[in-house]
Amino acid sequence: MGKYFGTDGVRGVANQELTPELAFKLGRYGGYVLAHNKGEKHPRVLVGRDTRVSGEMLESALIAGLISIGAEVMRLGIISTPGVAYLTRDMGAELGVMISASHNPVADNGIKFFGSDGFKLSDEQENEIEALLDQENPELPRPVGNDIVHYSDYFEGAQKYLSYLKSTVDVNFEGLKIALDGANGSTSSLAPFLFGDLEADTETIGCSPDGYNINEKCGSTHPEKLAEKVVETESDFGLAFDGDGDRIIAVDENGQIVDGDQIMFIIGQEMHKNQELNNDMIVSTVMSNLGFYKALEQEGIKSNKTKVGDRYVVEEMRRGNYNLGGEQSGHIVMMDYNTTGDGLLTGIQLASVIKMTGKSLSELAGQMKKYPQSLINVRVTDKYRVEENVDVKEVMTKVEVEMNGEGRILVRPSGTEPLVRVMVEAATDEDAERFAQQIADVVQDKMGLDK
């Protein structure tokens, strides 16, 4: 069986790997597995997308596939991934679909599904869809005549979602000046509207999408421009979202980056103080900084580590009934309010803590001392072979001996791209960079595409 689904749906270069033909099949087979075979003759399906130019092409093909199986499709237009998850659950739809490749370059696109409960698919559901994709021509229902359903536009869904987000905070942001970076993606209009509606004074960059500039030197993967904007406009802080709005990175008033670990710590500390943190637990991944765990320990907060990927964080949160979790990269899940990482939700919760405590973001983030961390991505021929490569294991052992317990190493395949990620934490910046480069050089030499 071919593996179509990665850790975050089906992704690839639009019109080359993720073709309209594949999008049609994903709509048809996904609609059948997740909605139609539950006995619903005309299951309701919500479809949203980000701002990529390929989104319209894939949306048309996907919707055709869904309608061909009998689905009643409501098109949400440009909206964030967590917006689709929330509306799917809130409106009682059988299925939600988001067309986006998140933080990836504009040439890529992706399709991810949400069940009626607003959660991403289980491995079993993905396997069922993949089994149909691997068949030559599976015999599935084909409605005809009056059984073919019109699709409709529900662009008001975005406002319904923003109204819900606004209801999750008890304060307005009058007196706060906030710089926003929409990554020229899904939150480009949503973020300024939401924070403006909460009476913040806003400055914006990356909020002028043209179909081609999504994530281009902007957004949560490139917060440097936002840092400049914060300092230049004397903003209290800045918030950078990614292309589909499911992750967030902040910038303090001095232009210093505040990552997902620090944001989780700030929000978790406030929840713990207010006795709102379930089981005094925050769920994180193996990528979280050593300083994050030490800071939690000092606050009397426990932590659980998962594999990298917000789906694994969510699985652990559901298993243990935990209500806060996330990743250093800025996927932060607040289960009391939504079922997936939500940049806008996290942003207003962070702003709420800043407003209520009267403390600056640098002061709040400074309570967590980060260990220097170096991350190098290596493009490789087969990312899954890194775990068995003898030469890579050998250099990792050598570095661990040299570190003498003062740091850690993590080498793993990316869940969404043909990359091996090499992460090293050490006592100093120089050590972290040197050790990471030593390991990355071996990965490149033995497995790299350009070796």
Swiss-Prot record:
| Miscellaneous comment as given in the Swiss-Prot or TrEMBL entry | Disruption of glmM results in a drastically reduced methicillin resistance and in teicoplanin hypersusceptibility.
Q: What is its EC number?
A: 5.4.2.10
Carrying Phosphoserine, the residues are: 102
**By what name is this protein known?**
Phosphoglucosamine mutase
Q: Which top-level group of life is the source organism from?
A: Bacteria
The record's keywords, sorted A to Z, are: Isomerase, Magnesium, Metal-binding, Phosphoprotein
A single GO molecular function term of this UniProt record: magnesium ion binding
By sequence similarity, the record places it as follows: Belongs to the phosphohexose mutase family.
Task: Give the matching PANTHER family.
Answer: PHOSPHOGLUCOMUTASE (ALPHA-D-GLUCOSE-1,6-BISPHOSPHATE-DEPENDENT), PHOSPHOHEXOSE MUTASE
**UniProt: Mg(2+) binding residues:** 102, 242, 244, 246
